[in-house]
Amino acid sequence: MDSAESELLEEEELPEIKYIDSAEFQNFDNNADQREIQFRWMEAFETKEPRWFRLLDEFITPLSGKRGYCSRIVEKYARVLLHQGFELSQTDGPLRVAAIAASRDVGQAGNLPSVLNNLSEVTRHLNLAQYASTSLATVGQRKFANEVVQKTVNQERLGCFHLFLIGYREGLENLLSNHRHLRNFRYSAKKRHDLLTEHIKNIFQERDSFIQAPEASSFALQTVLENWTFPLQNEQIVQLAHANTLQMRALHVKGDGFYFLNEALNVAIAFNWSSSQEEMEEFYSIFTPQATNPRGKRIFQFWKMISKYDRSNGNAQGFLVTAQRLEEESKSDDIGAGCVTAVELACKIRNQCDQHEDLSKTIMDTITRHPSLGPRMMQLAERCGVGYENEEIIHQICDRFSLHPSEPTWLDYVENLVQTVGRFGSVKETMQKSLKIMFEFLDFDSNRFNERAWSLFEKVLSLTDPSFVVPEWRTRFDWWPKYQRLRAKDGRKMSNMATKTRNDVLEALEELVL
């Protein structure tokens, strides 16, 4: 890159940062972290790689050092780079390896993030190095793993981490399962609680593998979930959780240790290990006297109640008090959008007790506090037999424009608007709003081949005065048609009829006089 081009890139204003994710971006306490990435492909074919990377790196750095990384965002970043056409050799910095991983469905191979993501919004925040490196291992790119680790993990932890990353899974498994203290610990797991506790304390007076690398506990959980040949199964998960819990207390992390315990409890719930769940529920007392992290403590209480309900085969009436408590606790500012798991259990209990009025109120209250959870709450309403509330839910979350613009829920909203033009405002306001929503929805690569969207867009255009279209089209006329007609790299296609509809819409737009 010559000096003139370099100067131009330095002076060039970065794209506006919007929309990281439909749920996570509301959870950040610091205003500086509440910026959002807007994945639209303006100038998609002319944008230079350094410009995009500067934008991504600006956001990556503070997050990876503060509160970890959101696993779904890693994949989105990778897809951004891949869509721009960048290869591995063209990128630079902590996400240089992400581009090659994007097209292979990173995170969908049954590892810890993808399995637990089905259980809770809470468990989606994982360590950047762990997730990125696991993704690399999944797609066979282990030779670059060391570079990722060096940027995100301190030197004391690097040795054990690197052992895993370069493919020596057996070595790490042996380190965890055959360590002399852990081996003795497994054999003595059924001893009285006080002797067991003393035994674990003795373990962590030495340089045990968990002390050297706290990530080892997460690796152990992953080996269980991915069905590797590994002895830590079923009740051994309890031993792992107990040892790690005591270690975290010894390191004076206090309430933060609840997050490690939550991971283990989630694994037990996912695999329906009832005895393991019951034992881990009692580990609460280890942290409670010193807990200073109210969010970690509250989340564990959520999962403890969920675990107890999961193990129970009794009448749901006996859990009505649990439902009430979950509804109250989910309103805490400490939890944010992570309250979704508590709300879902509360609604499940209400539904089994035929308390649909209270169920509907809980859903609507949740959406009022966290509009980004709207689509998930709509699915919950359908499952609990109160789907008739969905029209009100749609308008509540869409009227406030608090929903991610790529969400399919917008199509339901626009369809309702055009069916009742004038009901929710003047005709001009309704059509301008509908046009803006449809353009923004189709700006996203994931929506370009949505047949329903193009059919609905054609209907909106047929009802709209051309002058209403010009403001939105003016910012897109020079790149949008080419972008929409571009073949998808993953082979996505539409039917012939839908393709004709799309072409008719684009031709009508191209005929507009600006």
Curated annotation (Swiss-Prot):
Domain of life (superkingdom): Eukaryota
PANTHER family the UniProt entry points to: TATA BOX-BINDING PROTEIN ASSOCIATED FACTOR RNA POLYMERASE I SUBUNIT A, TATA BOX-BINDING PROTEIN-ASSOCIATED FACTOR RNA POLYMERASE I SUBUNIT A
Protein name, per record: Uncharacterized protein tag-51
